[in-house]
């Protein structure tokens, strides 16, 4: 089991960060970076369990102010610690490209980034662009056929593997239980 730290938000930052940070009411260093680095170096919430992965998200709402702030904090924590990053993305809006751009601006080595949910797309140009920039493709969510049918997922993985991208794909699924609302 590998613990992660980060913030999973499609829009805003959690309330405790809303007024604290560069240029805000309480103008101090970004507190999310401090939190993430502490989780990695000392442990999460004084448990002694150290995070070994950073996580952020960008989905259909796009690069909102909150999403960008979290993503930049994740990037800065990565630069400070070297811990890899996984990003929840929306393949249909090609948000993996936006995530790569923001993280690269923060100095992130894109070969340390998994672009999650890349497997929701059969757009080979999009997927090759992500991989060619250095990131791993999260070919996940097998079984969530309403996002992309199983056969299309398998075909996409097979084609990319034949094209030399086998080492740039992480095969997984993104659900561990039954969801009655899917």
Question: Which sequence ranges carry the predicted segments?
Answer:
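Core alpha/beta catalytic barrel or barrel-like domain that forms the active/cofactor pocket
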Residues: 4-14, 54, 88-90, 114-115, ...
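Alpha-helical segments flanking ligand/cofactor-binding loops in enzyme cores
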Residues: 75-76, 128, 158
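Short amphipathic alpha-helices and their capping/turn segments at secondary-structure boundaries
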Residues: 35-46, 153-167
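Short acidic, glycine/serine/threonine-rich loops at helix termini
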Residues: 13-17, 99, 126-127, 180-182
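Active-site gating/metal-coordination segments in enzymes
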Residues: 1-84, 136, 142-146
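Solvent-exposed alpha-helices and their adjacent loops that cap or buttress functional pockets
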Residues: 46-48, 79, 106-108, 162-163
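Active-site core of metal-dependent hydrolases
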Residues: 80-152, 177
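Short acidic/histidine-rich active-site segments
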Residues: 140-141, 166-182
């Amino acid at each position: 089991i590998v613990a992660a730290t980060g913030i999973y938000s499609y829009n805003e930052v959690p309330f405790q960060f809303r007024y604290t940070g560069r240029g805000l009411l309480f103008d101090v260093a970004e507190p999310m970076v401090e939190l993430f680095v502490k989780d990695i170096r000392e442990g999460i919430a004084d448990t002694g369990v150290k995070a070994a992965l950073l996580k952020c998200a960008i989905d259909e709402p796009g690069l909102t102010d909150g999403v960008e702030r979290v993503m930049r904090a994740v990037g800065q924590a990565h630069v400070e610690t070297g811990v890899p990053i996984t990003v929840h993305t929306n393949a249909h809006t090609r948000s993996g490209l936006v995530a790569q751009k923001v993280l690269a601006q923060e100095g992130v080595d894109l070969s340390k980034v998994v672009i999650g949910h890349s497997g929701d797309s059969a757009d080979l140009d999009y997927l090759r662009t992500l991989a060619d920039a250095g990131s791993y493709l999260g070919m996940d969510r097998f079984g969530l056929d309403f996002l992309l049918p199983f056969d299309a997922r398998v075909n996409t993985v097979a084609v990319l593997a034949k094209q030399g991208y086998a080492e740039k794909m992480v095969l997984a699924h993104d659900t561990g239980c039954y969801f009655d609302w899917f």
